[in-house]
């Protein structure tokens, strides 16, 4: 009985591991991993549907850009004193 149990465990273990020999499945798996690289965060902020997912990042970027723009408008003087 114990031998039958070991055979069942061995059979289910072998069946549960995916085969790496099928190049078609490897190609499909590699395509799925590149899906997140379609949009950069900056491009995502420009798309309304994507912007909602990373709104905090977009708002922080806009606040930084506005602060940088305001800083660039300040008169710049070198003070020797």
From Swiss-Prot:
Main location: secreted
Propeptide boundaries: 17-35, 78-81
Leader peptide range in chain numbering: 1-16
Localization per record: Secreted
GO terms for cellular component: extracellular region; host cell postsynaptic membrane
S-S bridge residues: 44-50, 45-58
Chain residue ranges for the region called Lacks the Ser-Xaa-Pro motif that is crucial for potent interaction with nAChR: 46-48
Keyword Disulfide bond carried by entry: yes
GO terms assigned for molecular function: acetylcholine receptor inhibitor activity; ion channel regulator activity; toxin activity
Keywords: Acetylcholine receptor inhibiting toxin, Disulfide bond, Ion channel impairing toxin, Neurotoxin, Postsynaptic neurotoxin, Secreted, Signal, Toxin
Tissue specificity as recorded in UniProt: Expressed by the venom duct.
Keyword Disulfide bond: yes
One Pfam short name: Toxin_8
Family note: Belongs to the conotoxin A superfamily.
Domain notes: The cysteine framework is I (CC-C-C). Alpha4/7 pattern.
Function: Alpha-conotoxins act on postsynaptic membranes, they bind to the nicotinic acetylcholine receptors (nAChR) and thus inhibit them. Has possibly a distinct nAChR binding mode from other alpha-conotoxins, due to a different three residue motif (lacks the Ser-Xaa-Pro motif).
Name listed for the protein in its UniProt record: Alpha-conotoxin-like Pu1.4
Organism, scientific name: Conus pulicarius
């Amino acid at each position: 009985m114990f031998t039958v149990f070991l055979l069942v465990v061995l059979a289910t273990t072998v069946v549960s591991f995916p085969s790496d020999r099928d190049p078609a499945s490897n190609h499909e798996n590699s395509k799925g991993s590149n899906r997140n690289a379609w949009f950069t965060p900056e491009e995502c902020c420009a798309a309304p549907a994507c912007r909602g997912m990373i709104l905090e990042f977009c708002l922080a970027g806009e606040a930084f850009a506005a602060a940088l723009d305001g800083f660039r408008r300040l008169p710049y003087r070198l003070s020797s004193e």
